[in-house]
Amino acid sequence: MRPPLLLFLTVTVLVSCASAVSTGNAAELRSLRSIKTTTNDDAAEEERGGFYHKFDLNFLDDIFHGLPEQFQRMRNQPERLRTMFENWKTGWMSVDDAVAYMTREGLSEKAISQFKAAYQAYLKHKG
């Protein structure tokens, strides 16, 4: 081999190895647009740059006043919650219309108040 070709290959290999970034095994500990790492729900919110709401429904509420499947998914899957709220917002559904819809779906008063607060927070977040 010629020396310039050998030198070129060596430099290419060294540069490619040095510039490769390892993602690591712990994806939840990765840095998201900041210097510090995150290990809580803030990571999902910052990564998506979206709305996140924590519901105050406990185990007894699930037993005595079970949520319909759609609202269970909205409570447990933040992306589903954002999608449904965006659909409501683009369909010009007001908060009162949303409450009427939840009443027709058979949600308990506590669940309605939780989802109403979440929808109001979403509308405020979206501006």
Swiss-Prot record:
Keyword Secreted (UniProt)? yes
Q: Name one GO cellular component term.
A: host cell
UniProt keyword annotations, A-Z: Secreted, Signal, Virulence
Biological role stated in the UniProt entry: Secreted effector that partially suppresses elicitor-induced cell death in host and enhances virulence of P.parasitica.
State the family named in the UniProt similarity comment for this chain: Belongs to the RxLR effector family.
Q: Which residues form a coiled coil?
A: none
Q: Where in the cell is it found?
A: Secreted; Host cell
Keyword Signal in record: yes
Just give the chief location class.
secreted
* Gene giving rise to this polypeptide: RxLR3
| Protein name as annotated | Secreted RxLR effector protein 3
What is this protein's expression induced by?
Expression is induced in presence of citrus root extracts or during the interaction with the susceptible host.
- Signal peptide positions on this chain: 1-20
What the entry says about domains is:
The RxLR-dEER motif acts to carry the protein into the host cell cytoplasm through binding to cell surface phosphatidylinositol-3-phosphate.
In chain numbering, motif RxLR-dEER lies across 30-48
